[in-house]
Amino acid sequence: MVTSVKVRAPSSTANLGPGFDVFGLALDAFHDEITLTKKPWRGVRILTADDIPKDPQQNTAGLVIKSMKQKFKIKSGIEMRIKKGVPAGFGMGSSAASAAAAALACNRLFNLKLDNKSLVKCAGIGEKASAGTIHYDNVAASLLGGFVVVKTKPFDVIRLEPPKDLVLCVAIPKLKVPKKKTKVSRAVIPKTVKLSDLTENLSNAANIVSGFLLKDSDLIGRSIQDVIVEPARKHLIPGFSRVKNNALNAGALGVTISGAGPSVIAFCKKSQNVKKVAKSMEKGFSSAKIDCETIICKPSIGPKIRV
């Protein structure tokens, strides 16, 4: 009988420009690790050396486990060890990686036999702890790997395999980010938009999906354009415009804010000089007197489970 399960789930980037709350892409840059162990008592206990809430109600992964315990009438106590590898608050899907790993581990530990859609819905509940609302783009990417498209009414999630030549460069500025940063960054998004802006974003979003279907990195890159959310959020990231322009001038196919920011992500191909793109992004942040770390990574195939 299985008494303990360990899951390692990848970081992710959401939105990809025009796909706000709809698109997600798993990245092999960072990982979170969750270990669930059955215990004789009834509650949920979190053990971690990281600076995150230990109250399950305030913790992304804890919220997922509490919800699944209630929904599936799990009587066993659960000890959860959390090892954070995804930097929190930088638009890399940190909360989602923990939520995804927790949902997958719980499914395996208690043999729930949930399908992918059900797992994504369970993991999405955890986002309420960090973002204040339930959304599924990052958790779907961390759970399923690859590129994901989320539909909410009715709920559905589609996974597509990324092109093999797609490479990402993520610039992570060394900024002090507020707690509940995702909630703060969502507050600046306009409540109403012009029809022409909506049309432009829809066109770009459709072309991004087409690019993943056709395995065309160039089409994906030139469609990474957002005229609604990015303009509203870019003022929260010092030096963003310079970072973006520098990366494009260095050969990046497309550049946008990674998730809710403040990280900036450039889409490239393996055949390009991606290190040149990375250096150009560092110089962009440097012009705003901001240090940054650049990570060159590729799409992740998804989480790993160990029993």
Positions of PLM-derived features:
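ATP-binding N-lobe of GHMP and related small-molecule kinases
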Residues: 1-90, 104, 108-114, 145, ...
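Acyltransferase
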Residues: 165-245, 249-250
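Gly/Ser-rich oxyanion-binding loop with an adjacent helix/lid
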Residues: 75-154
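Short beta-strand-to-turn element immediately C-terminal to the catalytic PLP-Schiff-base lysine
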Residues: 37, 141-153, 266-269, 306-307
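Short, well-ordered amphipathic alpha-helical segments that serve as non-catalytic structural scaffolds
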Residues: 59-71, 205, 243-245, 280-281
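Glycine-rich, charge-dense phosphate/pyrophosphate-binding loop(s)
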Residues: 212-307
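Short beta-strand segments
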Residues: 8-10, 26, 142-144, 151, ...
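Glycine-rich beta-alpha junction loops
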Residues: 11, 29, 172-177, 227-228, ...
